[in-house]
Amino acid sequence: MKYFVIALALAVALVCIAESTAYEVNEELENELDDLDDAAWLAVAEELQGLEDFEESRGLFGKLIKKFGRKAISYAVKKARGKH
């Protein structure tokens, strides 16, 4: 009977230790997950901020490309017709 009580006490002690460390691990994992969520949000925010600059530059270069593209097409048409 004495060994049964000792074994039961050891089992209870091991269960208590396992439970207490499980919460610490879960809290660490939740904190890491929160950090990853924050990092992902910051990466998206930086990407969107860079996208605004890209949109501005694309607008400027897009106009220039259209302008030169029209001139190139009209030049090619004139050359094909033999007028140039």
From Swiss-Prot:
One of its GO terms (molecular function) is toxin activity. Pfam families: Latarcin. Cleavage of the propeptide depends on the processing quadruplet motif (XXXR, with at least one of X being E). A motif (Processing quadruplet motif) lies at residues 55-58. It is found in: Secreted. InterPro entries: Latarcin_precursor. Keywords: Antibiotic, Antimicrobial, Cytolysis, Fungicide, Hemolysis, Secreted, Signal, Toxin. One of its GO terms (cellular component) is extracellular region. Expressed by the venom gland. Belongs to the cationic peptide 03 (latarcin) family. 02 subfamily. The mature peptide (59-84) forms alpha-helices which probably disrupt target cell membranes. It has antimicrobial activity against Gram-positive bacteria (A.globiformis VKM Ac-1112 (MIC=0.7 uM), and B.subtilis VKM B-501 (MIC=0.4 uM)), Gram-negative bacteria (E.coli DH5-alpha (MIC=1.0 uM), E.coli MH1 (MIC=0.7 uM), and P.aeruginosa PAO1 (MIC=6.7 uM)), and yeasts (P.pastoris GS115 (MIC=6.7 uM), and S.cerevisiae Y190 (MIC=54 uM)). Also has a strong hemolytic activity against rabbit erythrocytes. Causes paralysis, but is not lethal when injected into insect (M.domestica) larvae. This is M-zodatoxin-Lt2a. It comes from Lachesana tarabaevi. The lineage of its organism: Eukaryota, Metazoa, Ecdysozoa, Arthropoda, Chelicerata.
